[in-house]
Each structure stands twice: as structure tokens, then as C-alpha cells.
Swiss-Prot record:
Function text: Serine hydrolase involved in the detoxification of formaldehyde. Hydrolyzes S-formylglutathione to glutathione and formate.
Gene3D superfamilies: alpha/beta hydrolase (3.40.50.1820)
Family the entry assigns: Belongs to the esterase D family.
Source organism per UniProt: Escherichia coli O157:H7
GO biological process: formaldehyde catabolic process
Enzyme class: hydrolase
Protein name (record): S-formylglutathione hydrolase YeiG
Cellular component terms per the entry's GO annotation: cytosol
Reactions catalysed: S-formylglutathione + H2O = formate + glutathione + H(+)
Active site per the UniProt annotation: S145, D223, H256
Length: 278
């Protein structure tokens, strides 16, 4: 591992690291915020997954999460949104390829060689964080848009791994919206049954009651993608039918930007702290 940057921040440290990923077959970067140590108890971790076109730095520089994370004693880990490099398959569109990994394991050429973000987030990155930093094994997950989709599927596919999950403007039903249909058809092929294991709504309908974890979703009602791409009401209906403990908050006037995230990230951190710090 190689440290690329380090900055003092709210008595903690904001760092950026590069490592060689055996899962993704390329070098990867991630950012991490280490809060000031409190006692001898290792702090819990909140993983943040960003959206289309982003990398590990968008949340770090725009969300303003460090102050509250420092106060609460929560480590923040921000991975990249896809594998990257000259040898990694790409596309001219902003919503496919590098910067648009959709947090799944691709099965189709040319994507399958590198695009295994699900395995990277489930296994390799948490193991790396555990081995290199003083953290506990208690973790939660959150994200925005494509990253909200990622956070939800990570939680739904791994019962018991996360204490809680939250999302800002997530893509909840990718099987049925243009972003998801484009990505899934390329990454996973035309068999739509294979798509269902990466769709939060399908996963929630298939979930067991004992696996439900506290879930918070914020959605701005002035989001230009709300009607065509996001459709959080579809997941809310699944949660209702499954009695899943989910709160969906529609925030008047807010759009899809990091101004929206910055406005409510404190709520999300305090939401996760209730369960991470038990």
C-alpha cells in the first residue's frame, strides 16, 4: 500500500491510499478518514459508495462528513466507483465503464476481467482496512445514486455484515430504469433473471424477516432523475410488504447534487452511530 495524501482534519486524519487489487486486477485508490482516538476501543467503519462519474474523492471533499465522524468516533472509508487503468475496459458513455462499475460482478466480456466491485467491497477492501488500520469489525454502509444502489445490495446480499444501511437518491430498481438496463445488459448479458440478484427491490422481496436492518433513504423532490431513474416509492412498497424497517424521507426542493448530501449527511452519520456504537 502506498499513501498518496494525508491531511489533518478535525483532530483526525484524512488519507488517500493506493493498493494493488487482486480482485479487480488493477491498482485501486481509496480514501479514509480516521477520527481522533478516544480510548483503546477500535472505532467502527462506515463505507461510503459514490455515484456515476465519481471516484473516492467526491465525498471526501464535498460532503463535509469529517466533523461529525470525528465527534462520533466513526472511520469513513470511500472506495473508488470502478476498476481503472489503460488495460481496463471502458465506454464513451458516462454511465458505463470506468466510473460506473455499479458495484456488481460482471460476467460478460470485456467487463468480467476487471469489473468485480461486489467481491472487492465484500471481501478484499474490508480485509485490507482491518489489517492496515485500527478498526473494529462493526460496519455500516451508505451511498449516493449508483452508490445508494451499491449500499442497498451490499446490505441485502450480506445479512449480518452491516449494522445499518442508508442512501441518498438511490437507484433502487435498476432492472426497470434506463441506467440499470444499459449497465446490466452489458455487464451481465441479456438474461434478465441474472439481473435480479443485483436489484434492491428484488432482493428485498426475497429477504428473510430476521435479516432486516435499519434503513434510511433521503430523496430530494427536485431531483431531475427522480421519475425516470430512481423511483424510491418502488422500494418503499417492497419494504412495506416485507415489514422492513425503512424510513424514506422526501426532502422538498433538494436535487441530486452534493449540496443535498451535505445538507443531510449529519443525520445519516448519527443514524448509523445508533447501531455502530451499541
Amino acid at each position: 500500500m502506498e499513501m498518496l495524501e494525508e491531511h489533518r482534519c478535525f483532530e483526525g486524519w484524512q488519507q488517500r491510499w493506493r493498493h494493488d487489487s487482486s480482485t479487480l486486477n488493477c491498482p485501486m485508490t481509496f480514501s479514509i478518514f480516521l477520527p481522533p482516538p478516544r480510548d483503546h476501543t477500535p472505532p467502527p467503519v462506515l463505507y461510503w459508495l459514490s455515484g456515476l462519474t465519481c471516484n473516492d474523492e467526491n465525498f471526501t471533499t464535498k460532503a463535509g462528513a469529517q466533523r461529525v465522524a470525528a465527534e462520533l468516533g466513526i472511520v469513513l472509508v470511500m472506495p473508488d466507483t470502478s476498476p481503472r487503468g489503460e488495460k481496463v475496459a471502458n465506454d464513451d458513455g458516462y454511465d458505463l465503464g470506468q466510473g460506473a462499475g455499479f458495484y456488481l460482478n460482471a460476467t460478460q466480456p470485456p467487463w468480467a476481467t476487471h469489473y468485480r466491485m461486489y467481491d472487492y467491497l465484500r471481501d478484499e477492501l474490508p480485509a485490507l482496512v482491518q489489517s492496515q488500520f485500527n478498526v473494529s469489525d462493526r460496519c455500516a454502509i451508505s451511498g449516493h445514486s449508483m452508490g445508494g444502489h451499491g449500499a442497498l445490495i451490499m446490505a441485502l446480499k450480506n445479512p449480518g455484515k452491516y449494522t445499518s444501511v442508508s442512501a441518498f437518491a438511490p437507484i433502487v430498481n435498476p432492472c426497470s430504469v434506463p441506467w440499470g438496463i444499459k449497465a446490466f445488459s452489458r455487464y451481465l448479458g441479456e438474461d434478465k433473471n441474472a439481473w435480479l440478484e443485483w436489484d434492491s427491490c428484488a432482493l428485498m422481496y426475497a429477504s428473510n424477516a430476521q435479516d432486516a436492518i435499519p434503513t434510511l433513504i433521503d430523496q430530494g423532490d427536485n431531483d431531475q432523475f427522480l421519475a425516470d431513474q430512481l423511483q424510491p416509492a418502488v422500494l418503499a412498497e417492497a419494504a412495506r410488504q416485507k415489514a422492513w424497517p425503512m424510513t424514506l424521507r422526501i426532502q422538498p426542493g433538494y436535487d441530486h447534487s452534493y449540496y443535498f448530501i451535505a445538507s443531510f449527511i449529519e443525520d445519516h452519520l448519527r443514524f448509523h452511530a445508533q447501531y455502530l456504537l451499541k
